[in-house]
Amino acid sequence: MTISKVPTQKLPAEGEVGLVDIGSLTTESGAVIDDVCIAVQRWGELSPTRDNVVMVLHALTGDSHITGPAGPGHPTPGWWDWIAGPGAPIDTNRWCAIATNVLGGCRGSTGPSSLARDGKPWGSRFPLISIRDQVEADIAALAAMGITKVAAVVGGSMGGARALEWIIGHPDQVRAGLLLAVGVRATADQIGTQTTQIAAIKTDPNWQGGDYYETGRAPENGLTIARRFAHLTYRSEVELDTRFANNNQGNEDPATGGRYAVQSYLEHQGDKLLARFDAGSYVVLTETLNSHDVGRGRGGIGTALRGCPVPVVVGGITSDRLYPLRLQQELAEMLPGCTGLQVVDSTYGHDGFLVESEAVGKLIRQTLELADVGSKEDACSQ
């Protein structure tokens, strides 16, 4: 993977979206994406030595707006709103939190809905990308802003996969990591559910082979069905049954064409995503998740993990059925910088890493303590 050199650019003002040009990127598979732009936001001030950056890495349909209200450039409130700020787990009196919109996304960074050099949307021409490509793009964006090393990387789900690739591929550029609700590779169950979601989008007649952007028709039905299916994997069976059981939605009767309460809930989740996300990005990023394998090209998973010197905290959710605890246990046992799996007790399933603020906040603080130790060790070695 290679990235062309670009002039140094500035960090955006706090909470505002900045667009960082990183030039052309050659992907892991050899494809070239020209004129790549990465959307960036930050909270807190960069230290004079530029050594206090905490990268917050979003999951599949997230973006750079981790905290704060909706506003220009970010139509929804922060998706991890409690994580950063004065006195928060990432205390912006001490740390500078930076978040990007991932390569392939649709909230400012280059993705299939972006215009290629010919002035037309990339669409079906947008290449397959890997988690490693996403990390390379993030690192290039930081470098363009004059940042060559971060204190910590923090992420869950796809963000956890990005954090894992960061510490494996660039251990000299990060002092600590927090890996939440993730595994060393995509499992058969994940690939099965995720390829089914992709199929729901691609079988929508409005998909048009991925080149729908200038037609006035988008695969909205396919995207909402994909999201409904995905959302089932994000929550736990216990939580859903406790909330909805087999109840009807209000006065509706399923026997006469009405809906169940859980059906209405899932439709609402699909409609919410439709208002803020692009189907093309959903397909690209889901395919990226399917290809996740930290051992690829590194002599296998064991070799890749056991050779990583970065101190890490690994956390899992008790009720997570998309990334069950056994996957985090494997990570914790094989990473030499991990002292043991941290288990978060939650009924919220995979989404527990977003919801359980107290427990996950403790893990973030533990990670930043490791980063502080790394900072002192760096100072002693100079």
Curated annotation (Swiss-Prot):
EC number(s) on file: 2.3.1.31
Principal location listed in the UniProt entry: cytoplasm
GO cellular component labels: cytoplasm
For this protein, what reaction is catalysed? L-homoserine + acetyl-CoA = O-acetyl-L-homoserine + CoA
Enumerate the transmembrane spans: none
Pfam families membership: Abhydrolase_1
Which BP terms from GO are recorded? homoserine metabolic process; methionine biosynthetic process
Q: Where, in this chain's numbering, is substrate bound? A: R227, D351
Indicate the residues that form the catalytic site. S157 (nucleophile), D320, H350
Pathway where it operates? Amino-acid biosynthesis; L-methionine biosynthesis via de novo pathway; O-acetyl-L-homoserine from L-homoserine: step 1/1
The UniProt keywords, alphabetically, are: Acyltransferase, Amino-acid biosynthesis, Cytoplasm, Methionine biosynthesis, Transferase
Give all residue intervals belonging to the AB hydrolase-1 domain: 52-356
Compartmental location: Cytoplasm
Q: What class of enzyme is it?
A: transferase
Gene Ontology MF annotations: homoserine O-acetyltransferase activity
NCBIfam families named among the record's database cross-references: homoserO_Ac_trn, PRK00175.1
Instruction: Please explain the role this protein plays, according to its UniProt record.
Output: Transfers an acetyl group from acetyl-CoA to L-homoserine, forming acetyl-L-homoserine.
Family of this protein? Belongs to the AB hydrolase superfamily. MetX family.
Assembly behavior? Homodimer.
Protein name, per record: Homoserine O-acetyltransferase
Q: Say which species the protein is native to.
A: Mycobacterium leprae (strain TN)
